[in-house]
UniProtKB/Swiss-Prot annotation:
Record flagged with keyword Transferase: yes
Keywords assigned by UniProt, alphabetized: Glycosyltransferase, Lipid biosynthesis, Lipid metabolism, Phospholipid biosynthesis, Phospholipid metabolism, Transferase, Virulence
Gene3D superfamilies: Glycogen Phosphorylase B (3.40.50.2000)
GO cellular component: membrane
Extra remark: Was identified as a high-confidence drug target.
The name this protein goes by in its record: GDP-mannose-dependent alpha-mannosyltransferase
An annotated GO BP: phosphatidylinositol metabolic process
Source organism of the structure: Mycobacterium tuberculosis (strain ATCC 25618 / H37Rv)
Gene it is expressed from: mgtA
Length: 378
């Protein structure tokens, strides 16, 4: 495919670090490496914070104002502006990539339609599920109505997992295709294991069970409280968020490291014995894939993205959502006992999922919507 001009309208981007921003960074790296041009449109930091970068690795980042909506998400949401349309028109894209579109993505979608540019909408965040976790089911219903309207206007919707595809199709969203996520198998690897770190976390030698992620209601980290209280393992929680103080109070024996990135994050994964993910509202669940790459057997709820990533009784265990807490201690004990067998299979299961391979698939989706528009125009 010859050089393509791709405008990425990202609902979240650096300095926010999450699944959406991380995947956008990987896509940008691949576009640059393969000779394509990019523009990013993303939220600025909220009022009162330092301005976010306007240039990322040579790629222009057009920032829009952001606002906080704490009853819907802990992340700032970008507000579409007319300047965004001007930025798109000036860049003259061949395709507009909508990364986890919500409010800003909706503005980007309409701007693209006004300019006659095809769109690929990447569904990455289970906002309806998050709303339910925050105890506001009416918002969940409204969110589905919003996403149905938005994605029906896109030329193609990409879902990261089979479960998410099925959910979107059940909601009446058309033209849904699967596009998974890659993983850096060089960075996330068993070789990153750090024995000094392990001794600091568990000086008495107890098996180390870890969680990595944002400490927010939708992650249901409180489901690990019983495991922490059992005393059979050392629970290590890597991440930060609005629930941290409450969780630390509920799990005084757990180790809370705060957020970790890069080499420190890779060492944290590899220094665990078993990985547990506690939330069921995951469209993909990149942390599970990173844990598998690190050679960890994984336990997760039998819902959403982890179903595509975990092979039960081979790379980990999927537990019924309603029985997760009850079954968790026995599941952990089993994986600790059989760790070596599971660890080898876990690592092997992700070796073919590198970011270059996955991003080449994305380029194919770009080409498909461009071809569809060309055919319609003819």
């Amino acid at each position: 495919m010859c050089g393509v001009r791709v405008a990425i309208v990202a609902e979240s981007f650096l300095p926010q670090v999450n699944g959406v921003s991380n995947s956008v960074v990987k896509v940008l790296e691949h576009l640059r490496r393969t000779g394509h041009e990019a523009l990013v449109i993303a939220p600025d930091t909220p009022p009162g914070e330092d301005r976010a970068e306007r240039l990322h690795d040579g790629v222009r980042v057009h920032r829009v104002p952001s606002r906080m909506f704490p009853k819907v998400t802990t992340l700032p949401l970008g507000v579409p502006t007319f300047r965004m349309l001007r930025a798109l028109r000036g860049f003259d894209p061949d395709v507009v990539h909508l990364a986890s579109p919500a409010l800003l993505g909706y503005g980007g979608l309409h701007a693209a339609r006004r300019l006659g540019v095809p769109t690929v909408a990447v569904y990455q965040t289970d906002v309806p599920g998050f709303a339910s976790s925050y105890g506001i089911p009416m918002t969940a219903r409204a969110a589905w109505a919003w996403f149905r309207h938005l994605h029906r206007l896109a030329d193609r919707t990409l879902a990261p997992s089979t479960a998410t595809m099925e959910s979107l199709i059940a909601q009446g969203i058309p033209r849904v295709h699967r596009w998974a996520r890659g993983v850096d198998v060089q960075r996330f690897a068993p070789s990153a294991r750090n024995e000094v770190l392990r001794r600091r976390w568990s000086p008495d030698g107890k098996p180390i069970v870890g969680f990595v992620g944002r400490l927010a209601p939708e992650k249901h980290v409180d489901r690990l409280t019983g495991l922490a209280a059992s005393g059979a393992v050392r629970l290590v929680i890597v991440g930060d968020g609005i629930d941290r103080a409450r969780l630390q109070s509920a799990m005084p024996t757990a180790v809370f490291t705060g957020a970790r990135y890069g080499k420190e994050l890779a060492e944290a994964y590899a220094s665990m014995d078993v990985f547990v993910h506690s939330g069921e509202h995951e469209t993909f669940c990149q942390v599970v894939q990173e844990a598998l790459a690190s050679g960890l057997p994984v336990i997760a709820p039998d819902a959403g993205g982890p179903r595509d990533l975990i092979t039960p009784h081979r790379t980990g265990l999927l537990l019924p959502v309603g029985e997760f807490e009850h079954r968790l201690p026995d599941a952990v004990a089993h994986l600790v006992h059989e760790r070596q067998r599971y660890a080898l299979a876990a690592r092997r299961s992700v070796l073919g999922r590198s970011w270059p391979v996955v991003c080449d698939e994305l380029l194919g989706h770009y080409e498909a919507v461009r071809g569809r528009r060309t055919t319609q125009a003819a």
